[in-house]
Amino acid sequence: MSTNINPDAASASSTRDNPCYGGDPNVASVNVYADDEHCYLLPYAQLLYAEMIPNPAQEKNADAPPEKLAICFAAAEVTVLGTGLQAVARKIQKYELNFVKAVDRRFTASLKTHVAAVAVKFTRQTS
């Protein structure tokens, strides 16, 4: 069992140890490292759906990441931008996504899945 809690410490060259996302078949929530430097722990029990579409920002900016993955929870929507996001979607489908975070653009060439940006928007307040 790995005790490494820092996703940056993972090897960028291995598809199994991608610093953008991690998997664990025994998790009950996903740890979202957002670009606002906050970390959000969102429970799979509140997962509503995930949707992957082409990133609409590419129409105006050719350098924008080509894919957009929206992960919708009961009280929050996580937006992930990047390339090869189908691997992240497969982890969500199996409730195995442990964490997701953006990594520097310099890793793009060495990764099949690269997360360029992560944002969390709360859709309603919970009490």
Where are the regions that the model predicts?
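Short, surface-exposed polybasic-and-hydrophobic patches located at secondary-structure transitions
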Residues: A57-A87
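Anionic N-terminal interaction surfaces
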Residues: M1-P25
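Generic beta-strand hydrophobic packing signal
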Residues: V30, A50, V118-V120
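Phosphoinositide-dependent membrane-docking surfaces
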Residues: L42-Q58
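Helix-rich interaction surfaces within compact, conserved domain-sized segments
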Residues: E77-S127
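Short aromatic-glycine motifs in intrinsically disordered, low-complexity regions
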Residues: N26-L41
